[in-house]
């Protein structure tokens, strides 16, 4: 990994360094379980200690799609104390009812947000188009950025996933990203 970061340093590429914490299917169970605290902290601390001197790393990410709980709040507090110069990101932070974007993260992040409303195919009856119900789950990135009750930057941490011929809509994504100064961009 160090060679990659050295290349990013020399080429001027920005990196979001992510701890390897991912628990698909468990919906935050481990993030809220004290027995997992040490394992969560170990991954984040080792990442930050290992990579702290690479100027290409502009942001720490606590993990991905693992729900939210006290273990992530503790990681965020540690990262902010260890390195107050870099923002802290975590895509799964929106998992808390009533507090979808806790202040323990510095960046609001979603994956696979949708862009234009017409992609929902509103003229098709429910059930006729399997994609319609699936697409309706995802928030629209621009709507998140236009919320006035929060001034943190907004980004899509995963988008344009390439499965079948699904890769695309780059122009539509970037038109929306460029339309609002709170938008940071995204990761493919």
How should each PLM-predicted stretch be described?
Residues 1-188:
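Substrate-binding/catalytic cleft of secreted carbohydrate-active enzymes
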């Amino acid at each position: 990994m160090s060679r990659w970061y050295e290349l990013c340093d020399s080429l001027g590429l920005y990196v979001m360094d992510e701890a390897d914490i991912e628990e698909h299917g468990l919906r935050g169970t481990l993030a809220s379980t004290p027995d997992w605290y040490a394992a969560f902290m170990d991954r984040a601390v080792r990442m930050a200690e290992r990579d702290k001197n690479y100027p290409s790393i502009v942001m720490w990410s606590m993990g991905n799609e693992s729900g939210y709980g006290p273990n992530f709040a503790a990681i965020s507090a540690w990262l902010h104390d260890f390195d107050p110069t870099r923002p802290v990101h975590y895509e799964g932070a929106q998992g808390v009812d009533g507090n979808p974007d806790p202040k323990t993260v510095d960046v609001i992040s979603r994956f696979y947000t949708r862009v234009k409303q017409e992609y929902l195919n509103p003229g098709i009856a429910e059930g006729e188009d399997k994609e319609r119900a699936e697409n309706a789950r995802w928030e629209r990135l621009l709507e998140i950025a236009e919320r006035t009750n929060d001034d943190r930057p907004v980004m899509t941490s995963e988008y344009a996933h390439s499965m079948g011929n699904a890769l695309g809509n780059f122009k539509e994504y970037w038109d929306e990203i460029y339309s609002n100064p709170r938008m940071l961009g995204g990761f493919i």
